[in-house]
Amino acid sequence: MKVYLGGEAEVKILENVVVKTRIPKRYRIKELDRELRLRRTKMEAKIISAARRAGVPTPIVLDVEEDTIVMERIYGEAVKDVMSKDVSREVGRMAAKLHRAGIIHGDITPMNLILSNSRIYFVDFGLAFFDNKVEPMGVDVHVYFESLKASFENWERLRDAFIEGYLAEGGSEEVIERAKEIEERGRYVERVSMG
């Protein structure tokens, strides 16, 4: 068994399942904290199932109990270890499916994607939410672009492959343009703060 402790949850990886339990926050009022953890856990499970119905490979949710989700374990390789233009193109296709279903993943990075049996599985929907607006979709895409830039020398080719897949699957050109605008905003802030 492997145990990972993140800012929001403890994740136990067992032989066939993954058990994700949201951690209580001591700084919150106890009743409020419990309510938030229950609501967020239920919402995450609902979003995982909605993503799966939209045609995006995700772990199957097996059980939801209070602040804990039990889901299928996906065996495969982290996308960060097998990244290629084809893989990034497929990530773009799946991101478009999420967005067309009104789902914002919130953390599309190679660490939260698993390649298994030639399919890209999206995992860790802890920051996900439902929204149909261009801005959060643009942020979703921007997060992926930034993760590519931080991890891969050929990030521009990987970004372009993602865009190809995203648009081919019916993703909006406006979302891609918004992701580019968000990047420019960041550059402007950097120049102003340095300057």
Swiss-Prot record:
Transmembrane segments: none
Annotated catalytic residues: D107
InterPro entries: Bud32 (IPR022495), Kinase-like_dom_sf (IPR011009), Prot_kinase_dom (IPR000719), RIO_dom (IPR018934), Tyr_kinase_AS (IPR008266)
Function: Could be involved in the formation of a threonylcarbamoyl group on adenosine at position 37 (t(6)A37) in tRNAs that read codons beginning with adenine.
Reaction equations catalysed: L-seryl-[protein] + ATP = O-phospho-L-seryl-[protein] + ADP + H(+); L-threonyl-[protein] + ATP = O-phospho-L-threonyl-[protein] + ADP + H(+)
Protein name: Probable serine/threonine-protein kinase BUD32 homolog
Domain (Protein kinase) ranges: 1-195
Enzyme Commission code: 2.7.11.1
GO MF entry, a single one: protein serine/threonine kinase activity
SUPFAM superfamilies cross-referenced by the UniProt entry: Protein kinase-like (PK-like)
Record bears the keyword tRNA processing: yes
